[in-house]
């Protein structure tokens, strides 16, 4: 939750990060140097301007260079999604189609598991920040976790910087190529009282 980026009524995406079955992260430089594409924006635009526009809206870089951010996420994480390896597509594989599938799957998950709407359904909405002051209006970690558990049956991990909400991590397992379903978190939270402030 970055108050400087994305729609005022939506969480933006950081990525979809595959882990090993025992919860360990995969190599930091990705899993397939042959597919370490650097022109993600061009690949997506060539396939779907609608997807590209949605990525610009819901997956912006907080450093201002979306293509660099998407390339980083693809190389480090996308190349490690085993179900997106070209051999999984069979004889009908078209070069780079797995890139489009990776990003479109993530945006579908973002829409299906809409954190903003799930929190709002439990009465948890962003509050107006007070300039130069510590946030007074806060929610508890238990409130956040309960709201999202009510929506999807499992709790997330909630991450803060100080008291300010930074990220909500959802954990999934996958059946086949794209049947993702939420599961209990394997990580830890870094919040107690949460300042969930309006975007500006």
What are these regions (language model features)?
Residues 1-54:
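An N-terminal structural lobe/cap that precedes and organizes the functional/catalytic core
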Residues 56-200:
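C-terminal, well-folded lobe of enzymatic/effector domains
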